[in-house]
């Protein structure tokens, strides 16, 4: 059974993991935010606004973004970006732990990007305040039951142009949205960390 207690126990060993910026790299962080409403554990997602120059334009993502020179750690990036994008002060909640960093290599990125995903928990009353604040970056905020992400009934495919041709990618559908790509890969890291397999795999 997927529960907050399971997530806490699985990620507790990651809390003290050395989480710093490596030299000569471009960094970004995302926040996988959990809340519990009516006994159901839910996850926060955003749909990015359609924006020229954004490699993930219009895609479903976690709140987060790139590090600035003033950011002291990956967690600081995730917390600042979440506050700016959707108005949630997740630093007032519980930082459960970190997922493995990912190095993202894309032709449309000037430099490789090191992504740090961090898992948080906030109370439901605070979660209700989530709303797009930066409309030029975030089009929509929504919550998905964690169990939904592990249900094979919602596995789908999405067509996306890459390398001059349309390719099919696995995803998870929810109320007209499709969670796929980098966000799905982060979810896979989460599933591996908690020891529960996901039916949708990249």
What are these regions (language model features)?
Residues 47-48, 167, 185:
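Basic side chains
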Residues 11-18, 35, 53, 194, ...:
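Short amphipathic alpha-helical segments enriched in hydrophobics
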Residues 23, 178-182:
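Short, contiguous, pocket-lining structural segments
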Residues 33, 183-190:
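Buried hydrophobic packing segments
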Residues 1-24:
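Entry/capping segment at the start of metal-dependent catalytic domains
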């Amino acid at each position: 059974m997927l529960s907050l207690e399971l997530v806490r126990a699985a990620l507790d060993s990651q809390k003290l993991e050395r989480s710093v910026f490596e030299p000569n790299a471009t960094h970004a962080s995302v926040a996988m935010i959990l809340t519990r409403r009516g006994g159901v554990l839910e996850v926060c997602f955003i749909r990015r606004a359609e924006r020229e120059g954004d490699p993930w334009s219009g895609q479903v993502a976690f709140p987060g973004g790139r590090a600035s020179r003033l950011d002291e750690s990956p967690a600081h990036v995730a917390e600042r970006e979440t506050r700016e994008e959707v108005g949630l002060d997740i630093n007032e909640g519980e930082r459960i732990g970190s997922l493995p960093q990912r190095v993202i290599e894309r032709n449309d990125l000037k430099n490789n990007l090191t992504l740090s995903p961090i898992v948080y928990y906030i109370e439901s009353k605070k979660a209700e305040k989530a709303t797009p604040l930066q409309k030029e970056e975030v089009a929509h905020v929504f919550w998905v039951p964690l169990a939904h992400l592990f249900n094979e009934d919602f596995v789908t495919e999405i067509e996306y142009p890459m390398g001059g041709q349309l390719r099919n990618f696995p995803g998870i559908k929810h109320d007209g949205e499709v969670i796929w790509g980098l966000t799905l890969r982060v979810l896979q890291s989460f599933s591996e960390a908690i020891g529960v397999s996901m039916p949708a795999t990249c």
